[in-house]
A protein has these predicted regions:
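Retroviral integrase
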Residues: 2-153, 191-235
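Globin-like tetrapyrrole-binding proteins
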Residues: 136-137, 147-183, 196
């Protein structure tokens, strides 16, 4: 009799491998093939002085301002926030103009926010390079994304506070509170840049030194064999 006939007659003899054993064998094979990969930190930096990221912070409806136009230095991590009533191109034109006139950026990097794209000519007229990150590539926007998360974290109740997180003042950021947050952030030591954002913002030599260190590290990382993961690597 064939195996099929045996099965038809109700042959319940055990299979060579049970589903559980097959899965264990597969997992074992995976672990055998898996190669340990060292962790490498790839810093986002600019080899130009005075370059910035910018984005919009949603301050929720029925609050003043409705949005915050956030800027943060690519290298020095110095942060600026300007109040914004809406996301219209004309309103963003005003905050961009204010920022450009005061800080004279060499380059501004952002996502594809329509109000930013509508103001390309403003940047051109002021000799500001515009870099747009497409397809929501938030890895390239990590600096500004991380800072916006930091703002939210700084606007929460501390463990020692008697206040509650649902209280009105913790649901949005008022101009007074934003000023306090920025002052604290800009004057706190950052291990990434080995100084405070305010110090590097005030001293271009510190930024130049930081750029040189990042460039040197980047060149050394390029010589690492397993820096670029092959297709199929476990991460």
């Amino acid at each position: 009799m064939t195996d099929n006939n045996n099965l038809a007659k109700g042959d319940l003899s055990p299979l060579p491998f049970s589903p559980g054993k097959v899965m264990k064998r597969r997992m074992k094979d995976i672990h055998v093939r898996k190669k340990a990969i060292k962790i490498y930190m790839i810093k986002i930096y600019s080899n130009m002085l005075n370059t910035w990221f910018h984005d919009l912070y949603d301050n929720l409806p029925n609050h003043e301002p409705r949005y915050w136009h956030i800027f943060i230095g690519t290298n020095n991590k110095y942060a600026v926030a300007l109040p914004l009533n809406d996301k219209r191109a004309s309103s963003i034109h005003k905050t961009l103009s204010e920022f450009i006139n005061k800080y004279h950026p060499a380059k501004l990097t952002s996502d594809e926010e329509p109000g930013f794209l509508a103001n390309i000519q403003l940047l051109k007229d002021n000799n500001v390079t515009m870099h747009v990150i497409q397809d929501k590539n938030h890895s390239s926007l990590a600096v500004i994304d991380r800072f916006i998360r930091t703002i939210r974290d700084m606007n929460t109740v501390s463990e020692e506070s008697k206040h509650q997180s649902h209280e009105e003042k913790y649901t949005y950021i008022s101009p007074y509170r934003m000023e306090k947050i920025l002052n604290t952030y800009n004057n706190n030591y950052h291990s990434t840049i080995k100084c405070t954002p305010q110090e590097m913002f005030n001293d271009h030599n510190l930024e130049k030194e930081y750029i040189l260190k990042c460039m040197d590290r980047s060149e050394r990382q390029k010589r690492i064999k397993d820096l670029i993961l092959p297709v199929g690597s476990f991460v």
